[in-house]
């Protein structure tokens, strides 16, 4: 692509426009700069709210994939890629899922998490290769993340994913983007120009983070990873999380701290199992079988025993 064509394409993007509200931000004192940033940030949740129907459709596809043993794969470059990796990395400790159930891929590989890798996003072949390296299958869901909606790395990945029958989802912050035209589903929150022209780590990045939170959280709830609003599948891997596990058992059952600690010791800190045992009086093997029969849904297992 020629330089002139690239400039022309960027000029058409909402996310690359100049924000008329911040033309004189370089003249402002610190407090007023921060107030301008905060004012602009307040537009982000509204933009996300407008695309909830698209987010819901995406969640339904992700849930269907999980139920068939499929995976959720995020892919992006720069800030978009980092946000995908961040969200993916939070799923194992929060929901006790395997580390390869939600995967984050970033153009340039792991080094790009901390350092800019020159030209990494410009090659669609790298996007295809990244998905081949993780042995993408038709049961997986690929979410291509690109504020501009035109990142070659993401385009290459989405085209490959679609060619093998995987569900494809585009997340961009520009209407009618290239990746939206490729993917099966498009999520396109339009947050408008940034306070610093083209610095899409700001409002656009915030919108992406909110939506990625929604995709994984709602999907995990739908497959039984919560009871009420409690993280009953939390992986208690450090002192803080062990303390949280104790609190969750206490909150779910009304038991004492000592009783919560006792039943967690019996289950090896399996919170969901501990709650079921404490509420129903089941032994550990009976509770484990009941959870399996309920498909991992704690509420169903409790209802089946107490009905």
Swiss-Prot record:
GO molecular function: carbohydrate derivative binding; carbon-oxygen lyase activity; ether hydrolase activity
Gene3D superfamilies recorded: 1.10.8.1080, Glucose-6-phosphate isomerase like protein, domain 1
Active site (catalytic residues): 90 (proton donor), 121
Catalytic activity from the UniProt record: N-acetyl-D-muramate 6-phosphate + H2O = N-acetyl-D-glucosamine 6-phosphate + (R)-lactate
Pathway named in the protein's UniProt entry: Amino-sugar metabolism; 1,6-anhydro-N-acetylmuramate degradation; Amino-sugar metabolism; N-acetylmuramate degradation; Cell wall biogenesis; peptidoglycan recycling
Span of domain SIS: 62-225
Signal peptide: none
Keywords: Carbohydrate metabolism, Lyase
Enzyme's top EC category: lyase
EC number: 4.2.1.126
Gene Ontology biological process: 1,6-anhydro-N-acetyl-beta-muramic acid catabolic process; amino sugar catabolic process; N-acetylmuramic acid catabolic process; peptidoglycan turnover
Pfam families documented for this protein: GKRP-like_C, GKRP_SIS_N
Domain of life: Bacteria
Additional facts recorded: A lyase-type mechanism (elimination/hydration) is suggested for the cleavage of the lactyl ether bond of MurNAc 6-phosphate, with the formation of an alpha,beta-unsaturated aldehyde intermediate with (E)-stereochemistry, followed by the syn addition of water to give product.
Subunit structure: Homodimer.
Entry-linked NCBIfam families: N-acetylmuramic acid 6-phosphate etherase (TIGR00274), PRK05441.1 (NF003915), PRK12570.1 (NF009222)
Role of this protein: Specifically catalyzes the cleavage of the D-lactyl ether substituent of MurNAc 6-phosphate, producing GlcNAc 6-phosphate and D-lactate. Together with AnmK, is also required for the utilization of anhydro-N-acetylmuramic acid (anhMurNAc) either imported from the medium or derived from its own cell wall murein, and thus plays a role in cell wall recycling.
Family stated for the protein in its record: Belongs to the GCKR-like family. MurNAc-6-P etherase subfamily.
Name the UniProt record assigns to this protein: N-acetylmuramic acid 6-phosphate etherase
């Amino acid at each position: 692509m020629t330089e002139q064509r690239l400039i022309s394409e960027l000029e058409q993007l909402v996310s690359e426009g100049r924000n008329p509200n911040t033309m004189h931000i370089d003249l402002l004192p610190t407090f007023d700069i921060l107030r301008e940033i905060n004012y602009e940030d307040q537009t982000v949740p509204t933009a996300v709210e407008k695309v909830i129907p698209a987010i819901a459709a995406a969640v339904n596809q992700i849930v269907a994939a999980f139920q068939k043993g499929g995976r959720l794969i995020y892919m992006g470059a720069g800030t978009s890629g980092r946000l995908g990796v961040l969200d993916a990395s939070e799923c194992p400790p929060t929901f006790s899922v395997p580390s390869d159930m939600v995967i984050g891929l970033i153009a340039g590989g792991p080094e790009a998490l901390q350092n800019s890798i020159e030209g990494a996003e410009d090659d669609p072949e790298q996007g295809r290769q990244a998905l081949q390296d993780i042995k993408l299958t038709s049961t997986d869901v690929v979410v291509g993340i690109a504020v501009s909606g035109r990142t070659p790395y993401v385009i290459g990945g989405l085209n490959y994913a679609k060619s093998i029958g995987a569900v494809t989802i585009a997340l961009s912050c520009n209407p009618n983007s290239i990746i939206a035209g490729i993917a099966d589903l498009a999520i396109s929150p339009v947050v408008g120009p940034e306070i610093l022209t083209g610095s899409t780590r700001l409002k656009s990045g915030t919108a992406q983070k909110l939506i990625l939170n929604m995709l994984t959280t709602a999907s995990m709830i739908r497959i039984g990873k919560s009871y009420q609003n409690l993280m009953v599948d939390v992986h208690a891997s450090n002192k803080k999380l062990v303390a949280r596990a104790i609190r969750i058992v206490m909150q779910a059952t009304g038991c004492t701290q000592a009783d919560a600690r006792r039943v967690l010791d019996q289950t090896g800190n399996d919170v969901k199992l501990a709650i079921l045992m404490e509420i129903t009086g089941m032994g550990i093997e009976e509770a484990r079988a009941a959870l399996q029969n309920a498909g991992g849904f704690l509420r169903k297992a409790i209802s089946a025993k107490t009905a």
